[in-house]
Every structure is written in structure tokens, then in C-alpha cells.
């Protein structure tokens, strides 16, 4: 499929791999709903009020079965939605087909080119009947970046004149093409946006940087730093989905291997737990002395990547940073070392430096990089998200936590957006606790209650919030 020939005025207002997969997708959506109690209960609570009536949400987030349940929750609360995936490999094609069949335009399929990816990112802002999106639901910040960078390019084309990587080549070309058709395409759409809710660490970093520089054009909710997102999705989700991706891709026996996890934040903690749980010897690399000490106190060996490169069997990047595994590291690795990334973008591994060598595709999202001496390194998902590129991402239950936060943030921004300045906000503690409460019964948890005397003794309301905002869970 070639994005260059996709007609945005076509009567077919979607692009998916195969609409015939919709029946399969619907069956999996029905199963997922039973594991997503937060979203289901939010539907029940707010459906009569229709708090998102009039919201036109441009969504850029992995088009998975779990995301399908989120989309249908937003629609049940009154929103109109258009959707694209935030990663070229993460779409589950049957999920995309099922959501399209139910009436939501989706522009996503597994294995998009970068040109197609950025074309689809534009399509979520192309509403029929002269309407415009007024909300963004983002994961990684690409949809937000697109409107802001495009608006800047309307006034100064030099900002898209010098791409530094293949991603920027495709992005800048896509912006240039749209500006040739309509020189105010981006600013017209940017003017209608009430705010954005951002799902992941990388996108949140972008938002805080824009706020710091005075460039944030609308209010933003940092969903990632809700406790019921970062301490659950990032940790417990990765604890299950990392090894799922590695094993589906390679069938490798993890027990007995040396596995290196780069980064010991919430994502890295979950990855390290899962690898150790399957019998690997786990080493951690870190730049932060606090995180390094945490890793050491958990029994992990803290080393540098330079030390580990020629000794380990499996490498996982989880930092959100740039070239954490570089060309020299890969050149030093053992034959058939497995290299993968679970951070949002593909910049953590210097994949571009290996394009000079022969690549041998084993199967979708699994490649051998063949070095001049004959050594092979196994690269998963071309350095993009291994858990979504090589498997199906996090389990439904933990994603219900994250997506319940997203839904509440969308309601808050859409209904009370005028009360917020152009800054980055987090959901209040009482909503974080609400999200957790909605999920307890599904796993048989029973919550104790404070007596009046107990509440008075520790100085909190009987119904919460129970912790101060600065409390670290």
C-alpha cells in the first residue's frame, strides 16, 4: 500500500489491512472487555451524562484490541473519534478492522512504511463536513508534534529543511506535501485543539520541554505519571509483555542466559523481574545513582554497556534515551546475541549504523544483522517496541488502568479545559485512587476501611485521598 496514492477525499474513510478480519477482532474485543473493568464501569457511570458529546478526538495510540475497548468507551460517552497507530509495527489488524466495521475511521495496519505512518497521522485530523478535531489523545507525542511543527513550518520552511534521520525524512516530506496543497493546513487545525492527554514517558518529556520553552499551545494532561499508569502499565505490563515478545520472536530459552536491561525505571524494573523470573542472570545499566542503587539492592549486577557488550546473550533497552546501544556495542556482541527495545521510539539502538551491513530477514520483525566477520546479531522489531512489534503488548487488565486514566483525563480537559493554562497537569490523587478502586473486585481484592478515629489519627478523609501528592508508591 502506498500512502502517496491514498485519497483523503475517498468515500472509504479508513485504511486497514483487511476489513474481513472484523469478526475475529470483535470476538477478542468481547473477551478483552471482561478484563477491563475500569473502562466498563466508567461507561456505566458516565453514559447518561454524555460528557464527551461534541468532542472530536484525534487518537494516535497503538491500535490493539485493548485500544479498541478504549475507543468504544470514548464513543459511548459521546465522542467522535478518528484513529491511527503510534508505531508502524504495533497494530493488530483484526482490532483495526473491528473498530472500522463499528463505524470509527482507523488508519493503521501492521508493517506500515514511515511515509504511510505520517500520512495516517495526518488523516486523523481530516474530519468530514468541514469539522476539525478539538482533542488529541496521544502516545509518544507524534500527533501533537505534527500540528505544532507543521504550524511552525508554515512560517519558516527551514525547520523542515534538514532531517537528521529516516523518521524526520518521512515526516518533513509529509509536511511539505500538505503545505503545498494548503499553506495553513496545520495552524487551522491547531487553533481548534482544546488540549491533549499523553500516554507515555517519551511524549510527556516532549510536553514538559515545550512548556519550559513557552511553546505549548494548549493544556496537556500527563497520564503517564498517574500512579495507576506508571506503576502498573510500565512495571507490571512490561513484566509480562517483554518476554512474550522475545519468546514469540526467537523461541529462545531465557533460563541460564545473561540478560542486560538498560535503564531501571518502572519499565526496566518490570523487565528485570520477568527475565530473572524465567531464570536469567540479569545485569542492569544505569546513569542515575538512585536507580543504580535500587537495582543493586534487588540483587542485580550494575555494569556498563561497554562491560556487558561482549558477555551477555540478551539486551533490552528501556531508557527513553538515544543510542544507548551503539555501533561499537553491537560490534562487540557475541554471535546470535538478541537485541531489542521496549522504549517508545527506535532511537535507543543505533540501528542506522548497521544498515551498512547485510541484513537477513528471518520473519516479520526478526532480522539477522551480519557483520563482516560473519557474526550475526538478532535484532527484534528493527529496534522499535518489541512487546508490540513481536507480540500483542500488555495484557488487557493492566491496560484498563491506563485507559481509564485516559478517559477521565479526556473528560476533564474537554469539559473544564477553559480552567487550565497552557501547562502540563496530572490527574488529582482522588481520581488515581478511583481508578485503582475500580479494578479491585475483578481480582478478588477486599479493601479495608478506616474508622473515624483512625482517619482522624492519621489526618486523612475516610474516603481518601490517603496519600499526599509527593508520596512515592
Curated annotation (Swiss-Prot):
<feature type="binding site">
    <location>
        <position position="139"/>
    </location>
    <ligand>
        <name>substrate</name>
    </ligand>
</feature>
<keyword id="KW-0963">Cytoplasm</keyword>
<dbReference type="InterPro" id="IPR000043">
    <property type="entry name" value="Adenosylhomocysteinase-like"/>
</dbReference>
<feature type="binding site">
    <location>
        <position position="234"/>
    </location>
    <ligand>
        <name>NAD(+)</name>
    </ligand>
</feature>
<feature type="binding site">
    <location>
        <position position="229"/>
    </location>
    <ligand>
        <name>substrate</name>
    </ligand>
</feature>
<dbReference type="GO" id="GO:0071269">
    <property type="term" value="P:L-homocysteine biosynthetic process"/>
</dbReference>
<comment type="similarity">
    <text>Belongs to the adenosylhomocysteinase family.</text>
</comment>
<keyword id="KW-0520">NAD</keyword>
<comment type="function">
    <text>May play a key role in the regulation of the intracellular concentration of adenosylhomocysteine.</text>
</comment>
<feature type="binding site">
    <location>
        <position position="233"/>
    </location>
    <ligand>
        <name>substrate</name>
    </ligand>
</feature>
<dbReference type="InterPro" id="IPR036291">
    <property type="entry name" value="NAD(P)-bd_dom_sf"/>
</dbReference>
<feature type="binding site">
    <location>
        <begin position="200"/>
        <end position="202"/>
    </location>
    <ligand>
        <name>NAD(+)</name>
    </ligand>
</feature>
<keyword id="KW-0554">One-carbon metabolism</keyword>
<dbReference type="InterPro" id="IPR042172">
    <property type="entry name" value="Adenosylhomocyst_ase-like_sf"/>
</dbReference>
<feature type="binding site">
    <location>
        <position position="199"/>
    </location>
    <ligand>
        <name>substrate</name>
    </ligand>
</feature>
<comment type="pathway">
    <text>Amino-acid biosynthesis; L-homocysteine biosynthesis; L-homocysteine from S-adenosyl-L-homocysteine: step 1/1.</text>
</comment>
<feature type="binding site">
    <location>
        <position position="321"/>
    </location>
    <ligand>
        <name>NAD(+)</name>
    </ligand>
</feature>
<feature type="binding site">
    <location>
        <position position="64"/>
    </location>
    <ligand>
        <name>substrate</name>
    </ligand>
</feature>
<keyword id="KW-0378">Hydrolase</keyword>
<dbReference type="InterPro" id="IPR015878">
    <property type="entry name" value="Ado_hCys_hydrolase_NAD-bd"/>
</dbReference>
<dbReference type="GO" id="GO:0005829">
    <property type="term" value="C:cytosol"/>
</dbReference>
<dbReference type="Pfam" id="PF00670">
    <property type="entry name" value="AdoHcyase_NAD"/>
</dbReference>
<dbReference type="Pfam" id="PF05221">
    <property type="entry name" value="AdoHcyase"/>
</dbReference>
<feature type="binding site">
    <location>
        <begin position="342"/>
        <end position="344"/>
    </location>
    <ligand>
        <name>NAD(+)</name>
    </ligand>
</feature>
<feature type="binding site">
    <location>
        <position position="387"/>
    </location>
    <ligand>
        <name>NAD(+)</name>
    </ligand>
</feature>
<feature type="binding site">
    <location>
        <begin position="263"/>
        <end position="268"/>
    </location>
    <ligand>
        <name>NAD(+)</name>
    </ligand>
</feature>
<dbReference type="GO" id="GO:0004013">
    <property type="term" value="F:adenosylhomocysteinase activity"/>
</dbReference>
<dbReference type="GO" id="GO:0006730">
    <property type="term" value="P:one-carbon metabolic process"/>
</dbReference>
<dbReference type="GO" id="GO:0033353">
    <property type="term" value="P:S-adenosylmethionine cycle"/>
</dbReference>
<protein>
    <recommendedName>
        <fullName>Adenosylhomocysteinase</fullName>
        <ecNumber>3.13.2.1</ecNumber>
    </recommendedName>
</protein>
<dbReference type="InterPro" id="IPR020082">
    <property type="entry name" value="S-Ado-L-homoCys_hydrolase_CS"/>
</dbReference>
<feature type="binding site">
    <location>
        <position position="286"/>
    </location>
    <ligand>
        <name>NAD(+)</name>
    </ligand>
</feature>
Amino acid at each position: 500500500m502506498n500512502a502517496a496514492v491514498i485519497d483523503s477525499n475517498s468515500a472509504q474513510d479508513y485504511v486497514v489491512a483487511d476489513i474481513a478480519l472484523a469478526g475475529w477482532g470483535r470476538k477478542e474485543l468481547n473477551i478483552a472487555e471482561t478484563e477491563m473493568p475500569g473502562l466498563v464501569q466508567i461507561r456505566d457511570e458516565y453514559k447518561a451524562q454524555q460528557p464527551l458529546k461534541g468532542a472530536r478526538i484525534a487518537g494516535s495510540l497503538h491500535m490493539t484490541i485493548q485500544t479498541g475497548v478504549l475507543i468504544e468507551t470514548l464513543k459511548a460517552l459521546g465522542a467522535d473519534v478518528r484513529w491511527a497507530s503510534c508505531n508502524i509495527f504495533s497494530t493488530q489488524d483484526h482490532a483495526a478492522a473491528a473498530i472500522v466495521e463499528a463505524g470509527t475511521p482507523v488508519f493503521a495496519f501492521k508493517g506500515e512504511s514511515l511515509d504511510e505512518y505520517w500520512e495516517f497521522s495526518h488523516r486523523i485530523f481530516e474530519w468530514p463536513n468541514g469539522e476539525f478535531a478539538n482533542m488529541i489523545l496521544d502516545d509518544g507525542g507524534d500527533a501533537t508534534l505534527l500540528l505544532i511543527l507543521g504550524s511552525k513550518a508554515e512560517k519558516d520552511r527551514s525547520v523542515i529543511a534538514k532531517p537528521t534521520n529516516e523518521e524526520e525524512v518521512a515526516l518533513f516530506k509529509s509536511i511539505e506535501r500538505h503545505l503545498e496543497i494548503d499553506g495553513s493546513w496545520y495552524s487551522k487545525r491547531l487553533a481548534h485543539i482544546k488540549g491533549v492527554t499523553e500516554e507515555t514517558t517519551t511524549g510527556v518529556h516532549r510536553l514538559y520541554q515545550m512548556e519550559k520553552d513557552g511553546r505549548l499551545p494548549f493544556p496537556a494532561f500527563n497520564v503517564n505519571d498517574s500512579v495507576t499508569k506508571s506503576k502498573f502499565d510500565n512495571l507490571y505490563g512490561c513484566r509480562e509483555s517483554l518476554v512474550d515478545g522475545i519468546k514469540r520472536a526467537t523461541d529462545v530459552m531465557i533460563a541460564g542466559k545473561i540478560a542486560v536491561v538498560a535503564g531501571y525505571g518502572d519499565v526496566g524494573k518490570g523487565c528485570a523481574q520477568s527475565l530473572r523470573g524465567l531464570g536469567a542472570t540479569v545485569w542492569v545499566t544505569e546513569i542515575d545513582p538512585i536507580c543504580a542503587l535500587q537495582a543493586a539492592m534487588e540483587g542485580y549486577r550494575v555494569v556498563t554497556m561497554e562491560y556487558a557488550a561482549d558477555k551477555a546473550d540478551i539486551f533490552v533497552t528501556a531508557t527513553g534515551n538515544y543510542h544507548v546501544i551503539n555501533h561499537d556495542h553491537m560490534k562487540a556482541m557475541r554471535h546470535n546475541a538478541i537485541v531489542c527495545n521496549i522504549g517508545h521510539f527506535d532511537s535507543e539502538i543505533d540501528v542506522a549504523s548497521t544498515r551498512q551491513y547485510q541484513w537477513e530477514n528471518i520473519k516479520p520483525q526478526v532480522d539477522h544483522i551480519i557483520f563482516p566477520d560473519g557474526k550475526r546479531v538478532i535484532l527484534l522489531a528493527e529496534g522499535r517496541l518489541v512487546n508490540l512489534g513481536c507480540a500483542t503488548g500488555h495484557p488487557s487488565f493492566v491496560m484498563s488502568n491506563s485507559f481509564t486514566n485516559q478517559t477521565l483525563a479526556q473528560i476533564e480537559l474537554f469539559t473544564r479545559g477553559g480552567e487550565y493554562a497552557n501547562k502540563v497537569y496530572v490527574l488529582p490523587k482522588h481520581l488515581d485512587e478511583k481508578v485503582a478502586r475500580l479494578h479491585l473486585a475483578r481480582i478478588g481484592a477486599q479493601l479495608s476501611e478506616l474508622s473515624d478515629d483512625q482517619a482522624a489519627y492519621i489526618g486523612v478523609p475516610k474516603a481518601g485521598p490517603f496519600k499526599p501528592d509527593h508520596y512515592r508508591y
